[in-house]
């Protein structure tokens, strides 16, 4: 079994050629980590990185499931029992998405401050609050809307998990594997959305649609298991932790960089579509099945049977999106994705318009059109999620080459800035889900269909395609000077001050290899 401590080689005072091993005990703390050292990576650090990635994925997977509890529960909450309209249910999804988005930036920073393992343990523990609270709430139908809104906001704690887990994965893996690692972390994490929808389907099949609290009860158990696993098997990397007094210049540098905002806009289009459609897809299907004349029970069953397909394919696509971006380039794949999403949104508008002009006719054809177009948007958004996240470390690694730093300091700078940008981009992107919820809610309230909202989505995808082409796809890297200028505008924001003093200075590649070896047990 792999030991959970880092073994460091130091020169023996009796023989310079004979290394001795120093154990760091059972504290789960690693004092030095260099994923770019190929020898150390193959000698054992790869196993440590994989183990940390595994448990990061577990926490983000369960976080997504808790975050997207309400799209499933809404389908299992008949209006005659709980008294909530379709508009009320859209509002629950909007609140959950909004709070999850706002928590992502502080979660990313907290991981850097407190350590990956420490924060992952805490963030898993707090998932028990919405899981238990929602279980209690659903066993007492007839309550007003506001306590449900509070519980929906608390499920946003699961949305914050993503940013900290992605920052952790970014820190443990070498640049050549970041696309794959981030794709796996994001993709398997995103599988938490279809997973809870399948749990909802299982609940309907076994106990009927009137016991939604059983879904929450299951996740209370799963989260408790995750807390134990994370605390036992994850690591803190001391050199990856950032002192609180250094956060201000880091955040200032990130927010004053044009690439941060442009990447956020691109992720707004990809991840915003994924999480937004995940929240509304089941509700849209249920509304259309009811309009076809199906009973509420059958409409609910059919909606739950189909709603998981889109998020499932999107999560799988994200994994392959990261790998494909490693091969063909993140910007090129992102451009292709947005062009295809524009076309898919146009087809969705056609299906919705056909339904509006021929009310009661062609229902079967329009339902097929709805489903196919939504699934296409899900798959494309998953690919785009992987490609945009590949762009982040690539862009800032390229920017670091224009800075007057040693090779080791340059890697530290790139990792710190990329980690914070990942958190900010994740938060900004999730706001796209809020926009999708609000746009569809208003569209259904005013016109009874989602056509107006679909027009907005198509224009946003087209604008994102143009942005990607003009800024990123037409050149190899971004304007290096812009980031450097942002860093040196104020003395407190110089690169050396951003990364701080290094705990271990490396005198040679051989020294790095000797210090950075983890031995398997």
Language-model regions, residue ranges each:
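C-terminal ends and interior cores of transmembrane alpha-helices
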Residues: 125-141, 339-363
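Hydrophobic core of transmembrane alpha-helices in multi-pass small-molecule transporters
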Residues: 144-160, 359-385
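Extracytoplasmic
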Residues: 51-82, 277-282, 436
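Extracytoplasmic gate region of multi-pass secondary transporters
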Residues: 70-75, 257-315, 382-385, 389-390, ...
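Cytoplasmic helix-loop-helix junction between adjacent transmembrane helices
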Residues: 149-188
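Conserved MFS/SLC helix-loop-helix module at the cytosolic interface between two early adjacent transmembrane helices
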Residues: 102-145
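Helix-loop-helix hairpin linking two adjacent transmembrane segments in secondary transporters
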Residues: 185-235
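Glycine-rich segments within core transmembrane alpha-helices of 12-TM secondary carriers
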Residues: 159, 179-204, 422-436
């Amino acid at each position: 079994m792999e030991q959970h401590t880092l073994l460091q080689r130091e020169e023996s005072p009796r023989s310079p050629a004979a290394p001795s091993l120093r154990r760091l005990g059972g504290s789960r703390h690693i004092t030095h980590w260099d994923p770019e050292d190929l020898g150390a990576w193959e000698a054992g650090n790869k196993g440590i990185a994989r183990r940390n990635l595994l448990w990061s994925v577990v926490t983000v997977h369960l976080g997504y499931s808790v975050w997207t509890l309400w799209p499933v529960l809404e389908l299992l909450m008949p209006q005659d029992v709980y008294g909530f309209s379709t508009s009320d249910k859209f509002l629950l999804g909007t609140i959950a998405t909004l709070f999850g988005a706002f928590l992502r930036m502080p979660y990313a920073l907290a991981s850097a401050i407190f350590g990956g393992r420490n924060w992952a343990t805490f963030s898993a523990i707090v998932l028990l609050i919405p899981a238990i609270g929602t279980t209690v709430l659903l066993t007492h139908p007839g309550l007003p809307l506001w306590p449900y809104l509070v519980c929906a906001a608390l499920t946003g704690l699961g949305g914050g998990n993503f940013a900290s887990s992605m920052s952790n994965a970014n820190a443990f893996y070498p640049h050549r594997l970041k696309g794959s690692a981030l794709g796996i972390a994001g993709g398997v994490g995103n599988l938490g959305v279809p997973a809870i929808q399948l749990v909802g389907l299982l609940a309907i099949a076994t106990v009927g649609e009137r016991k939604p609290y059983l879904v929450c009860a299951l996740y209370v158990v799963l989260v408790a298991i995750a807390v134990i696993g994370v605390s036992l098997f994850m690591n803190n990397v001391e050199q990856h932790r950032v002192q609180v007094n250094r956060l201000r210049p880091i955040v200032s540098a990130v927010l004053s960089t044009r690439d941060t905002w442009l990447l956020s806009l691109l992720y707004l289009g990809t991840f915003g579509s994924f999480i937004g459609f995940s929240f509304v897809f089941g509700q849209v299907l249920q509304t259309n099945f009811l309009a076809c004349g199906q009973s509420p029970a059958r409409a609910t069953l059919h909606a739950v049977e189909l709603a998981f397909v889109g998020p499932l394919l999107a999560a799988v696509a994200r994994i392959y999106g990261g790998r494909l971006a490693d091969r063909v380039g993140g910007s090129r794949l992102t451009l292709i994705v947005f062009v295809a999403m524009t076309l898919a949104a146009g087809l969705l508008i056609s299906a919705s318009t056909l339904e509006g002009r021929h009310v009661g006719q062609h229902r079967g054809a329009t339902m097929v059109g709805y489903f196919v177009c939504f699934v296409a948007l899900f798959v494309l958004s998953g690919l785009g999620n992987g490609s945009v996240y590949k762009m982040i470390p690539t862009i800032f690694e390229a920017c670091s080459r224009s800075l007057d730093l040693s090779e080791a300091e340059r890697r530290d700078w790139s990792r710190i800035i990329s980690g914070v940008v990942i958190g900010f981009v994740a938060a900004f992107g999730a706001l796209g889900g809020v926009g999708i919820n609000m746009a569809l809610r208003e569209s259904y309230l005013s016109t009874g269909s989602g056509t107006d909202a679909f027009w907005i989505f198509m224009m946003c995808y087209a604008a994102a395609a143009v942005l990607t082409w003009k800024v990123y796809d037409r050149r190899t890297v971004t304007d290096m000077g812009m980031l450097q200028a942002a860093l040196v505008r104020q003395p407190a924001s110089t690169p050396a001050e951003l990364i701080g003093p290094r705990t271990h200075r490396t005198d040679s590649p051989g020294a790095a290899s000797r210090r950075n070896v983890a031995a398997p047990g």
